Structure formats: C-alpha cells, structure tokens
C-alpha cells in the first residue's frame, strides 16, 4: 500500500504554463487523506514559490523544495541543507567567469527570497520571476543576508549539458544538475531530491516500497531510484524512462493528476496500487 506520493513539478505535474487544476487536486487530496496517503511536491523550485503555488493546500501536503535542500512538513521546516556564504560567493564568481554564461544571468535561492545581481538582464529577471518569489536585485552578493540553498543559472539548449559539466568539474563541494528550461541548479553534492524525500520517510516511518514518485528530468533521478515505484511522463528524458516501472502520458495532458485519480477509483484500481 502506498503511503506517500511524490511528484516533480515542471515537466511532470504542471503544464507548460506552470499551472494545474485545483478542483481536481482538491478531490485527490481528500481521497488521499481517507486512505492515509501523503502528497508531496518535490521540486527544484524555491520553498517560497512552492508554498505559493499550493497556497490553498499547504496544510494537506509536504514540500521537498530547492532540489532536496529544504523539507516542510505540517508547515514546519524539518530539514535543510544550505551553502555557506563563502561557498555561494565562490560559485557566483565561477558562474560569472563561465564561457557558457550570459553575464550575470543567475540567481541565489534563499529562505526569505531570491537574489540576482543588479547587472542581470531584464529578460532573465522577468523569466526567473515566474519560478521564484520575492526576487531582489542586489549590487553585490556580499550584501545578501539570508540562508542560501542553491544557485540557478540558465544556458542555451545547446550548451546546458556542457555548462553543467563545466561547473561541476570546478567545485569540490557542489554539483550542477539540469532541471529543465535549459537551466542548472548548483547545490551541495550531498543533496538531491532523494535527500529530502528520504528525510521525510524517516520522520514519518514510511518504507521505500510505500513510496510512489513521478519525474521527468535528471534532477529527479535519485528520487525515482529511491521510490518503490517510479513513473515517468512521456516527455521525460530517456534516462528517467529507463529507471521507471511505467511511462504515462505527457505533462500537458495532466497525466500525473489522472493517474492519482485512478488510484482512488475502485473501478479502475488494479493490483499495482496494492490497496
């Protein structure tokens, strides 16, 4: 029997506009509550952005945010891993010097807000504000007074994998991971979405085989490996499909929502759901 259902957001649960059907989710969460199943949003998005995205349901779910760096259960931050100031300042200097970067088009994701350099392009700030809350321009990252979970940077579709490798090769304590939208997140190399999900399972005494997870991109890989049942969307990368027990429809068809609804439908339920 599943006790926890975790899903990635962009490219998995959300459509191309970053939205979902709230009425359908409300019904799913009511059904999950009856069956003792916890719904978890697991994303590279910031904690602030996730809590805003699910503002109507915050007390009915858990959040694995910042690619596993922050875990919120029952409204409380119960687990976090963050960069030191020395570390994130070094990473900003590295990104600025990268041949794959466009100037200062990168962001620091913190507990209280998100921070971009005052020289970041307007186009980048407009784009990134769709995924982060309280985006602030600062003249120097030295002035940032916040807990920083990760950095995120955008590349072109042609250079994102090269940029990811270039950054990772130059840091001993952090990795760059592709997250979709031609972007990378730079996080501590001890942290993945699995880290946050595993911490959640330990806190709630949930076994791996009781976990169902959905994903599409490489930053979902470890989470799907951890889950007892892994499911990829049709638009997922081949590496993700290869480790999944099932491939469902694309995110544009709200396939994850449909799957969860069918989990609660006695007529459509099959032995895979194990109730």
Predicted features along the sequence, with ranges:
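Short, structured coil segments at secondary-structure junctions
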Residues: 57-59, 67, 170-172, 226-227, ...
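Active-site phosphate-binding/coordination module
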Residues: 20-122
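Asp-based phosphoryl-transfer active-site loop
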Residues: 3-18
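Conserved acidic, metal-coordinating active-site core of Asp-based
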Residues: 94, 101-214, 220-222, 235
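Short, flexible loop segments at the rims of nucleotide/cofactor-binding pockets, characterized by
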Residues: 16-19, 40-41, 129, 189-190, ...
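Mg2+-dependent phosphoryl-transfer enzymes with acidic/Ser/Thr/Gly-rich catalytic loops
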Residues: 1-4, 22, 185-275
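Short active-site oxyanion
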Residues: 36-40, 59-61, 149-150, 209-210, ...
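Short hydrophobic/aromatic-enriched beta-strand-loop microsegments
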Residues: 60-66, 81, 126-129, 175-176, ...
């Amino acid at each position: 029997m599943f006790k926890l259902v975790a899903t990635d957001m962009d490219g998995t649960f959300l459509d191309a506009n970053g939205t979902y059907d709230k009425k359908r989710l409300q019904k799913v969460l009511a059904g999950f509550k009856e069956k003792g199943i916890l719904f978890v949003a697991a994303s590279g998005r910031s904690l602030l952005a996730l809590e805003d995205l699910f503002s109507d349901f915050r007390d009915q779910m858990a959040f694995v945010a910042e690619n596993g760096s922050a875990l919120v259960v029952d409204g409380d931050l119960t687990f976090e891993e963050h960069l030191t100031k020395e570390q994130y300042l070094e990473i900003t200097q590295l990104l600025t010097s990268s041949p794959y970067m466009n100037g200062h088009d990168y962001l620091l994701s913190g507990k209280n807000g998100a921070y971009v350099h005052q020289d970041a392009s307007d186009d980048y700030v407009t784009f990134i504000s769709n995924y982060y809350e309280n985006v602030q321009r600062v003249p120097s990252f030295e002035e940032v007074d916040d807990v920083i979970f990760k950095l995120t940077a955008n590349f072109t579709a042609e250079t994102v994998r090269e940029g990811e490798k270039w950054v990772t090769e130059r840091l001993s304590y952090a990795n760059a991971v592709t997250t979709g939208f031609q972007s990378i997140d730079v996080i501590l190399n001890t942290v993945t979405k699995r880290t946050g999900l595993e911490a959640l399972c330990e806190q709630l005494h949930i076994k791996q085989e009781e976990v169902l997870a959905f994903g599409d991109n490489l930053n979902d890989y470890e989470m799907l490996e951890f889950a007892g049942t892994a499911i990829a969307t049709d638009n997922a990368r081949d590496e993700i499909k290869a480790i999944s027990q099932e491939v469902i429809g694309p995110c544009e068809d709200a396939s994850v929502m449909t799957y969860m609804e069918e989990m609660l439908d006695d007529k459509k339920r099959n032995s895979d759901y194990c109730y």
